[in-house]
Amino acid sequence: MSKVTKVVLAYSGGLDTSAIIPWLKENYDCEVVAFVADVGQGAAELEGIEEKAIASGASSCYIADLKEEMVADYIYPSLKTGAIYEGKYLLGTSMARPIIAKAQVECALAVGADAVCHGCTGKGNDQVRFEGAYAALAPQLTVIAPWREWDLRSREALLDYLAERDIPCTASLEKIYSRDANAWHISTEGGVLENTWNQSNELCWVWTKDPENAPEKAETVSILVEKGEVVAVDGEAMSPFNALTYLNEKGAEHGVGRIDIVENRLVGIKSRGCYETPGGTIMNEALRAVEQLVLDKESYEFRETVGLKASHLIYDGRWFTPLCKSILAAADELAQDVSGEVVVKLYKGQATVIQKRSMNSLYSEEFATFGEDDVYDHSHAGGFIRLYSLASRIRALNTQKKQK
């Protein structure tokens, strides 16, 4: 391996990546450039982050505003597939990683770096997601993963490491929970959640109201969907990020989008987390409602198949692969007629579709009515059923012959 001279670090401003900066300089004798991705984690998380990076030893700090791109080019395409990992998880952390890695690589190439670095632990999925993206986008770059190299194995050790070098740090030993936030969701892991028999408490939820304490009066939101994408909410045209932000606020107020799950990590272990995805939950319900009107049976079944495969590809860090690209393209084609208007009721943790319509709807009241009608000849069903069940009939006849 050739000597590393300049490395671009995916920097969050947290304890881990603050310690990584001096560690890289000491162990690789290289220049460290901090790269910060603004994916909607909030202004508080970004306040003073450039100064913090420089104080930790970075030569410079670049902050990339990726909020709109993340929603438009990563979240919306994923939504079209219907991807929900293991039937529950709307892939909040998973979808943020490819865009962060892509922008980090672009930064590395722009500043002439020969290496990239991340602060992911050796137990999690994110190391695979980041390094899979690096390999697909810039295989010539050296990848440094400090958590697989250093001997700093505890929060206390990291704090001592920074204190010994007089590097300021606002972190403390008292931190119990691990959190990850972006425009799509907030995840909370660790603490009481590490025992699956423990109930979550108020510290496990930071974004949404407890449904029990949510407003007693329901609220509705009207969502306009065009080609599988939310383009307006409550009569106002909005950009993807603004639409998500608006629905996040509405959903969080009513306790929408909470899940407490145990999931199968890619690396082979199970983990428990409390995930909050208020706006995403509302968007997903709206899109699926329009699909119910527009997609024929075979197309809907295929979209479900696409969604299942997409959920594993995205979760497993396979965004930048030919298969994932093909899956996303298929979902986008299916979504060309997925346009309509949906009204969603928000109440006590639930997002319930109560009205839906589409100019492309295949639903016909004339054909669907249980009352008397003149458009459907019931006698036609007999021939269809006979042909539809022909294979079963032949199989049964063969079985009867064998038994004689």
From Swiss-Prot:
Keywords in alphabetical order: Amino-acid biosynthesis, Arginine biosynthesis, ATP-binding, Cytoplasm, Ligase, Nucleotide-binding
Localization (cell): Cytoplasm
Classification via InterPro entries: Arginosuc_syn_C, Arginosuc_syn_N, Arginosuc_synth, Arginosuc_synth_CS, Arginosuc_synth_type_1_subfam, AS_cat/multimer_dom_body, Rossmann-like_a/b/a_fold
EC code(s) of this entry: 6.3.4.5
UniProt key word Cytoplasm: yes
Positions of ATP binding: 10-18, 37, 119
Catalysed reactions, semicolon-separated: L-citrulline + L-aspartate + ATP = 2-(N(omega)-L-arginino)succinate + AMP + diphosphate + H(+)
Cysteine pairs bridged by disulfides in the record: none
Cellular component annotations (GO), alphabetically ordered: cytoplasm
The UniProt record lists the keyword Nucleotide-binding: yes
Positions bound to L-citrulline: 89, 94, 125, 129, 178, 187, 263, 275
Pathway as given in its UniProt record: Amino-acid biosynthesis; L-arginine biosynthesis; L-arginine from L-ornithine and carbamoyl phosphate: step 2/3
Binding locations of L-aspartate: 121, 125-126
Top-level division of the source organism's lineage: Bacteria
GO biological process, one term: argininosuccinate metabolic process
Single annotated GO MF: argininosuccinate synthase activity
Family of this protein: Belongs to the argininosuccinate synthase family. Type 1 subfamily.
PANTHER family tied to this protein: ARGININOSUCCINATE SYNTHASE (PTHR11587:SF2)
Subunit structure comment from the entry: Homotetramer.
Name of the protein described by the UniProt record: Argininosuccinate synthase
Species this protein is from: Photobacterium profundum (strain SS9)
Gene that this polypeptide is encoded by: argG
